[in-house]
Amino acid sequence: MDNIETILRLAEEKILLVQSLKVLQEYKVEFLGKNGIVTNELKKLGSLSEQDRKEFGLKINKLKEEIQNIIKAKEEILEEEELNLKLSSDKIDLSLPARRYKQGSIHPITQCMEELIQVFAKFGFSIEDGPNIENDFHNFTALNFEDDHPARQMHDTFYLKGQENDKPMLLRTHTSTVQIRAMKNGKPPFRFIAPGRTYRSDSDMTHTPMFHQIEGLVIDKDINMGHLKYVITEFIRCFFENSNIELRFRPSFFPFTEPSAEVDIRMSKTDKWLEVLGCGMVHPNVLKNVGIDNSQYQGFAFGLGVERFAMLKYNIKDLRQFFEGDMRWLKHYSFSSFDIPNLAGGLTK
């Protein structure tokens, strides 16, 4: 009995003075471990009578429980002290200089694309999208390209391995493919633009193998060339934010439109004419290829290069600079991520 009380007092004295969890663990082993003080006391049970063994066993179990409670209580105190110490050492020093915040910026192509979309939204155009990898039908045949058209040649188009419905696979050369898919899957009227990446085997100051296009389509009853001229004229003046800009429509040829035209602009009478886009009335064969009755519906289409419009508006001289990743160039020509294009506040800040 006296020995049990002595062990309990010894445990209380040692544990209450502990200042670290490591030392507390050592005392736990000392008293309750495999070769600990309490465990050694249990070994005395074998030398006692049955009655004394029962009484002594109860006392040892009670001793063990009390020591465990003392250790647990001390452990909670030490853990709280350790946490408070850590929190106090982790305080933010407000006198330290702040880290420089590096904010990203908007690439001029992205900015130009957003501005163009904003302008077309003014005329009620929605947005359609489609795959970059296409088959020959959507890219050429449905758009009235002849089998021997130069655009079908390997030196102009990136062909891929494999076929779809016995048609060669390729990287789309224009976003007109989106127009074909939309007309096949829907019913007129249509009024949408198709922005996206396009691919052609060409590279110089004014051409890159990958470039961005926006192509537009309007299909409805009683659509004529006057509607096309109005939309293009108002779009150009709105995008360049210049109501005095001059436009001229030159006769041209595209397989998918008839009649066809190319649009030139100049900012003032002293400037040279600059070609900016192609357009025309949708060819009846194109409507026939997508199952639209060309005796009831007509329409117009247009296509423009986003890089071309960005170069003209932001005064960029070389198309290849858009994709070279020169941080100095990007810093000069990029836009703030807070300057979201809108017609009310002005497209470009």
Swiss-Prot record:
GO MF term list? ATP binding; magnesium ion binding; phenylalanine-tRNA ligase activity; tRNA binding
Q: Where this protein primarily resides, as one coarse class?
A: cytoplasm
Instruction: Please indicate if the UniProt record lists Chloroplast as a keyword.
Output: no
Q: Which cofactor does it need?
A: Mg(2+)
Query: What is its subcellular localisation?
Result: Cytoplasm
Q: Entry cofactor note text?
A: Binds 2 magnesium ions per tetramer.
Is Aminoacyl-tRNA synthetase a UniProt keyword of this protein? yes
Family as reported in the entry's similarity comment: Belongs to the class-II aminoacyl-tRNA synthetase family. Phe-tRNA synthetase alpha subunit type 1 subfamily.
- The name of this protein is Phenylalanine--tRNA ligase alpha subunit
In its UniProt entry, the species of origin is given as Rickettsia bellii (strain OSU 85-389)
Which gene name belongs to this protein? pheS
